[in-house]
Amino acid sequence: VSGCAECRMPNRDTYTSPNAYINFAAALEMVLYNGKMKKYGDEIVGLETGNFEDFESFDEVLEAYLKQQKNLIRHAFIQQHEIIRLRGEHFATPLGSSLHKLCRESYKDLHQPSIPGGIDLGYFEFIGYATVVDSLSAIKKLIFEEKRLTKKELLEAVNNDFKGYEAIRQLLLHAPSYGNDDSYTDEIGQLLDLEAQKFTHKYGKELGVHMDLRLVPFTSHVPFGKVIGATPNGRFSYTPLSDGSSASQGADLNGPTAVLLSNYKTKNFDYEDHAARLLNIKLSPSCVEGENGTEKLVQFIKAWHDLRLWHLQFNVLNTETLRQAQKQPQLYLSLIHI
């Protein structure tokens, strides 16, 4: 195991392309502001996909988002191509190479791509997955289907960070959310995953890179959130995005098994252009208390295994513990922060 969620093969894994962290919540914000982001004012930082208020259907919103998503991935691939080229020219790891069988046999350094017999890996991170999925779900449900909100009202609410718009925020927070075994939202999540993998499969080799889709942010969803304004899932401006393939903070209301099922339903098992998917789940102490609780936990892990999911990390915490940790972090250093 390498890091938190990756499996590695000794003496087979060789070149691993430095990964790109892509803020897909930025792609969503570019849809709302026609290629702009609130933090950067009038600067055009993405594609100009049209005025949000002019979209007449959810399909048009989704099409605009996917254009922004593909544009970010494409630029990440171009960047990775240059990194790969420069890395082999300027970096070397003599000690690590001397310990690797294939490097010794081929007289090549680990930083060189295409070592005979080796497995070349690379990946890009989807940061803000559930934030984007939940936001698109809320737009689809509340604006285009139930018509409880107008596009103008949504833009005004997020543009003002929901100050004076708490009623709208509550509507958004109670829209269908990923992590609740709700096919309405999970189908959107599966589509975003599919489109990312299809793009990777088609264009990765053309651009000279091997890049798989990965959802392991470590803690990057926190600083990435600091450049993203309020989002249509009810998230406040510049607060953390969702982490990994986990549900948005506080959005998983139907229990931990529902989170597993959403994670399963959003994966595209037929595609191979995917890597690790980090999944964090919180359990209350009462859920795992005593022999009965231990048995429940065992069955939960078995369910995760049977669903062929990649990674599972559960933290046994209650709300009061987390609040105390915020006040006195030095007393809670053993809490896992991934």
Regions found by a protein language model. Give the residues of each.
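Conserved catalytic cores of very large enzyme subunits
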Residues: V1-I336
